[in-house]
Amino acid sequence: MLIDSSIAQAYIESSCVDAFRASWLFEHTSVSLDLGRNAFTPPPEDLALRETVRKLERRICEAAAHFVPVNRPIWDALFPDWEAVQPTLDLIVGYPEPYDAVAAHSPDGQAHLIFDLIRWCNYAELDQLDSVIRNLLTHEITHLLIGHRYPAADAALESTDYLTRLDAYTFHEGFAHLLSYQATEIDCVDWHTPQLTEVAAASRAKLRLALMETDPDRQKQFLEEAVCGSYYEKFACMCGMLYLADRWEMQGIDGLKSAFADYHGFAQRALSIRI
């Protein structure tokens, strides 16, 4: 994995990071698409924050150098050539909340993971920081691997058709959340806790409403709530993840391979969660 920490380093060294405003990292990613503008947000001029960013930059570089994905056997099955996909990890500052980790492709088509280290300051004091890094690397690289293996599902994320986009969101986020969940191997997760049972019911109810919605303004709101907000309230992410956990429990790797074969209609299929 290549690492480009030039923006984070400029901030650490008190250089002018505003010079990076025109970079594609702020102009041409899902963040700028979500915001409808250049995503650059001037970072605070704070010495203590700079020191935290410096420590985070070092820890993330060390973890990335020795990265092993969570649920590697599933990666091996779904993405057999995953080791040939070598993304660049961009360590930056300048994204607004809540964009801490983003998968993207540069204008020349190269795969990138973008970590905003000021947003990562929320995790800086966690004892399990290495686990958080592994979780987010697994999550974001899964998005890149889906795009590499299944370009149509990737393109559908920006479709102008509401249901196509909802399918793509549920598919993409379902797999990314499943494979990275709590940085824990899938067989070691209890998918039937009272909390997850409640999350499944609430997410399924909201996804059902989203699938029936015809008003353009409400559709836009549903698409935002599908993948944004607090972790367990992102209904498309949760429905997709728990549906796939169901498939795993019933059919193992074969169930996940079958689910990966077609994103079309995935949101509707995700309503069949048994959890």
Q: Predicted segments — roles?
A:
Residues H192-I275:
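Pan-zinc metallopeptidase signature
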Residues I118-L137:
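Short pre-active-site segment immediately N-terminal to the catalytic Zn-binding motif
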Residues M1-R50:
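N-terminal mature-domain "stem" immediately C-terminal to a signal peptide or N-terminal signal-anchor/transmembrane
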Residues E62-P69, V132, L136, L166, ...:
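Soluble non-cytosolic domains of exported or imported proteins
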Residues L136-H148, G174:
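Catalytic glutamate of the conserved HExxH
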Residues V53-I114, D130-S131:
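Auxiliary, metal-adjacent structural segments of Zn-dependent hydrolase domains
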Residues H112, D116-I118, I146, Y162:
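Extended, well-ordered protein cores
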Residues S15, L78, H148-K206:
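Post-HExxH zinc-binding segment in Zn-dependent metallohydrolases
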